[in-house]
Amino acid sequence: MDVIVSGRHCHVSDDVRSQVEDRLLAVDKIRDRVTRAEVVFTAQNVKGSPDQAMTCEITLRSRGPVVRAEGHAEDKMVAFDKAADRLRRRSAALTNWVR
Protein backbone atom coordinates (compact mmCIF):
# COMPACT_ATOMS: atom_id res chain seq x y z
CA MET A 1 0.00 0.00 0.00
CA ASP A 2 1.33 3.42 -0.95
CA VAL A 3 0.88 6.12 1.69
CA ILE A 4 1.02 9.74 0.55
CA VAL A 5 1.04 12.48 3.20
CA SER A 6 0.83 16.12 2.10
CA GLY A 7 -0.15 19.53 3.42
CA ARG A 8 -2.05 22.50 2.05
CA HIS A 9 -1.09 25.87 3.53
CA CYS A 10 0.98 24.09 6.19
CA HIS A 11 4.19 22.12 6.59
CA VAL A 12 4.02 18.43 7.47
CA SER A 13 7.09 17.44 9.47
CA ASP A 14 8.87 14.14 8.96
CA ASP A 15 7.80 13.06 12.46
CA VAL A 16 4.10 13.57 11.69
CA ARG A 17 4.54 11.91 8.31
CA SER A 18 6.14 8.80 9.83
CA GLN A 19 3.50 8.54 12.59
CA VAL A 20 0.70 8.71 10.03
CA GLU A 21 2.34 6.08 7.80
CA ASP A 22 2.95 3.75 10.75
CA ARG A 23 -0.63 4.01 11.99
CA LEU A 24 -2.13 3.37 8.56
CA LEU A 25 0.16 0.44 7.79
CA ALA A 26 -0.65 -1.13 11.18
CA VAL A 27 -4.32 -1.65 10.27
CA ASP A 28 -4.40 -5.25 9.03
CA LYS A 29 -7.99 -5.11 7.77
CA ILE A 30 -7.27 -2.53 5.10
CA ARG A 31 -3.59 -3.12 4.35
CA ASP A 32 -4.20 -5.99 1.92
CA ARG A 33 -7.17 -4.45 0.13
CA VAL A 34 -6.14 -0.82 -0.24
CA THR A 35 -3.71 0.12 -3.00
CA ARG A 36 -3.21 3.76 -2.02
CA ALA A 37 -3.84 5.91 1.05
CA GLU A 38 -3.78 9.69 0.74
CA VAL A 39 -3.63 11.92 3.82
CA VAL A 40 -3.97 15.68 3.32
CA PHE A 41 -3.61 18.20 6.15
CA THR A 42 -5.15 21.62 5.47
CA ALA A 43 -4.60 24.71 7.64
CA GLN A 44 -7.51 27.12 7.86
CA ASN A 45 -7.44 30.53 9.51
CA VAL A 46 -10.30 31.07 11.92
CA LYS A 47 -11.51 34.62 12.60
CA GLY A 48 -10.87 35.75 16.14
CA SER A 49 -8.51 32.88 16.94
CA PRO A 50 -4.72 33.12 16.95
CA ASP A 51 -4.46 29.40 16.17
CA GLN A 52 -5.11 27.69 12.87
CA ALA A 53 -7.74 25.01 12.56
CA MET A 54 -6.45 21.82 10.97
CA THR A 55 -8.43 19.53 8.71
CA CYS A 56 -7.22 16.02 7.96
CA GLU A 57 -8.68 14.17 5.00
CA ILE A 58 -7.91 10.48 4.58
CA THR A 59 -8.74 8.81 1.27
CA LEU A 60 -8.37 5.06 0.76
CA ARG A 61 -8.31 3.86 -2.84
CA SER A 62 -8.82 0.25 -3.86
CA ARG A 63 -10.13 -1.64 -6.86
CA GLY A 64 -13.61 -1.07 -5.48
CA PRO A 65 -15.09 1.86 -3.63
CA VAL A 66 -13.15 4.92 -2.49
CA VAL A 67 -13.49 5.45 1.26
CA ARG A 68 -12.94 8.96 2.59
CA ALA A 69 -13.09 10.53 6.05
CA GLU A 70 -12.38 13.96 7.50
CA GLY A 71 -11.38 15.20 10.94
CA HIS A 72 -11.12 18.74 12.32
CA ALA A 73 -9.03 19.96 15.28
CA GLU A 74 -6.37 22.50 16.24
CA ASP A 75 -3.59 19.88 16.13
CA LYS A 76 -2.57 17.72 13.17
CA MET A 77 -2.47 14.42 15.03
CA VAL A 78 -5.78 15.06 16.82
CA ALA A 79 -7.37 15.82 13.44
CA PHE A 80 -5.82 12.62 12.06
CA ASP A 81 -7.16 10.58 14.99
CA LYS A 82 -10.68 11.93 14.44
CA ALA A 83 -10.50 11.14 10.73
CA ALA A 84 -9.12 7.66 11.46
CA ASP A 85 -12.01 6.97 13.87
CA ARG A 86 -14.51 7.92 11.18
CA LEU A 87 -12.58 5.83 8.69
CA ARG A 88 -12.82 2.75 10.91
CA ARG A 89 -16.59 3.09 10.87
CA ARG A 90 -16.67 3.53 7.10
CA SER A 91 -14.20 0.74 6.37
CA ALA A 92 -17.08 -1.72 6.65
CA ALA A 93 -18.12 -0.60 3.16
CA LEU A 94 -14.71 -1.58 1.83
CA THR A 95 -14.69 -4.89 3.71
CA ASN A 96 -18.18 -5.87 2.54
CA TRP A 97 -17.43 -4.97 -1.07
CA VAL A 98 -14.37 -7.24 -1.27
CA ARG A 99 -16.25 -10.32 -0.04
Predicted regions span which residues?
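N-terminal, polar/charged subdomain of small-to-medium soluble alpha/beta proteins
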Residues: 1-99
